[in-house]
Amino acid sequence: MPEPIRIGWLGAALDGPGGGYDKIHRMAFDEAVESGLLDRPYEFVLHAENGLPNGSARNATDGFRYLVDEGCIAVAGAYSSDNAITVAPLANEMQIPLISWAGTERLQGEYCFRLGNGDCGGDAALVVQWLKRNGHERVAVLSEISPNGEEYFRFFRQEARRRGISIAAVETVSQSPADLAVHLESLRKAEPDALVYMGYGMLAAKGLMREALDRIGWDPPRIMGTAFMFYLMGFDKFEGWVGIDQFAPANPLVPRFLERYRARYGEDPPMWPNAIPLLSYDTSRVLVEAIFRAPILSGPGIKAGLESIRFMPSSTGGPQTHIACSPYEHGMFRGDWLLYGRVTNGRLEFEGLFEQWED
């Protein structure tokens, strides 16, 4: 019997070995084996990562080295921008492809591939479009000091200037401010049409944002980037927010994924419905495609396999989303892969797709 193909998951099994995301990853590979797309066994090697912002950069790089030492020929993980920026040079040095969900444009190199759980520039453009479409032309911005926050705000200022959106007030905060309500109160005093949050998302995911808004009694129209998809930490924490999302009920692959998952495991995917299970499934499917297309089962071979993918159907994003890659073009989502969601009464709602605009 041939030796199994080893794939590494660096912090990517979000709820641990045997959890829902591990099941999703295995479902894509099991389907490939059952259909004959993969003609040899596979083995997953999981590492918890424990990287930034709560852990350390060294934990992330040590985790990547561990997976390579275990014989993995590709690694999915380093999903936050902090860790992607940290691990990217190592992936390039060791010639083992890294597939990350990071939104940063600083994930760069021959062996760095991005199935973005957002895009710092794209998020900003869509946020500004939503503001413009809804008549919010004078806004307040909560800008966070973090790799994502800095990048988001740089793009946001550019897009706001382009579309004629005025930034009435800015408050700059860390990822753990001493009193968030004080900063939000300062923004409220500017009497903006809407509130914009530009940051990684832990302020919302930990419930600090909702607590602070409730404390000062402020309920403005509000929007954030793909920090919104930290709703997997609890929809109640994101009540009333619009955000950049990747879950589109009209995508025909969404009900097919749900049907297959239920048939295989007898339960719903984690916190269904939301985008993260779909993104996990597509990540695993992309790895399968890369293995199938690889001229040799090695790091460079998987890289070549990834770079040959074109018009691969995607369950993530809108109905026209597809996945593609080529040499030196490693951002893999194409089409309407970013869209709008809203949390109302503790549930995720579809808020709409990108719409063309005229000068």
Locate predicted features.
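Extracytosolic ligand-binding ectodomains
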Residues: 1-359
